[in-house]
Amino acid sequence: MAAKEKELYDFYTNNIIPDNSWTSWADFYNVINLCNTILHYAPGAQAKDGNYSVDELRTHEAEAKSIRALCYFYLIRTFKKVPLVLQATIGDDVDFKVRASSEQEVLEQIIADLEWSKDYIWNKKFFVDVREKERTFQ
């Protein structure tokens, strides 16, 4: 049996050890850090680029917060208590030993992120009328 197959078999038979890749939350925290990085740098980008509107900034922030909320939702469903990291990991001076937050704390952050995001993401017009595009090419 290949190593990956063994890890999956161990996962399904509840013979789980900490270095089993099927139980790693590293990929979730990579995505969370990317979202936090967007939230950290996007306001500065908008301030420097006159073509990057505040509406676009808010939409991008809402998307990042929504994706971060989804990651935390999956994490607490799987692990219950997880570290709640809301700042981007930039540089080496960051404390990498973050205490695990309670499930309630993480749920409150998920709700806060989604409540904030709903005003900027759900009412956007994502599709362009074909007739508008047609005028561009005539």
Specify the residue positions occupied by each region the protein language model found.
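Aromatic-lined, polymer-binding surfaces characteristic
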Residues: 130-138
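Short glycine/proline- and charge-enriched loop/turn segments
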Residues: 88-95
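Short, well-structured active-site flanking segments
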Residues: 76-88
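Conserved, well-structured interaction surfaces
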Residues: 2-79, 95-108, 114-130
